Amino acid sequence: MKYKQIKNQTGLKTIFISGTAGSGKSLLTSKLHEYYSKNGAFAAVLNLDPGVENLPYTCDVDVRDHVDYVSIMKQYSLGPNGALIMTNDLIASKIDDIQNEINHINPDYLIVDTPGQIELFAYRSSGRFLVENISSEEKTNIFLFDGALITSPVNFVSIALLATSIRLRLNLPTINVLTKTDLIGIKLKNILQWTTNLSTLENAISNETDGETYTLSTNILRGLNLDGFTQELLPISNVTGEGLINLESALSRILNLGEEVEG
């Protein structure tokens, strides 16, 4: 499917929030919007998930106003996954309508809450099209490492590989964020060590598994290291908001050349 391209709008800074299902994308969207608003910046939220029922924030722009997931499922006799695929592809054809709403609101920051199933957004051409054609002066992506999933070193490597794959697909500067820090307790220290000392992570893998799983995990790890994987993983609590100041600073380095919102 070919989609109509539109001209860029200057001034707007766009933040995509991606991650595995249940990693806390919508909660972080809500917290980040609240943070910007409290500190004097005009932020708006775009919901890109056509199948979501309840959200912890008020949408400024909502794709559910443009496509009806349930109607498509009934009209074409599709299952839930098939309907989500078709609906997500249809969203790209509504880019002019979505952009007009964004232009009318004219925010400083647009926070984009991406679909729960990341493959529908990151690996289909419609998702890449939306990333490229939402008009914005600067864009970045926040990828969420679900703290509940990555307490195991093998799982950590798997999610790190996914994060790298998403960065490749979206072609955006990416900030990696660790969510649910309030739920993982003392394991937080180990996870943060893995991100700064890959030999520590490799030792943890060897203590957990052996054989083919060990070989595959360490080979992936070394490949990520060659690609410059070692980087800061910012811990965030979506419950308390702890860590948001560090996240905003990281966003400012990308979007505002280091100039932070007033706090």
Predicted stretch roles:
Residues 50-52, 116, 182-185, 240:
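Short, glycine/acidic-enriched loop or turn micro-motifs at the edges of active sites
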Residues 119-218, 224-226:
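Conserved catalytic-core segment of NTP-binding enzymes
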Residues 254-262:
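The C-terminal output helix
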Residues 224-239:
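Beta-strand-loop-alpha "switch" segments that mediate conformational coupling across diverse proteins
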Residues 17-18, 47, 111-114, 142-148, ...:
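Conserved beta-strand segments of the P-loop GTPase G domain that flank and frequently precede/overlap
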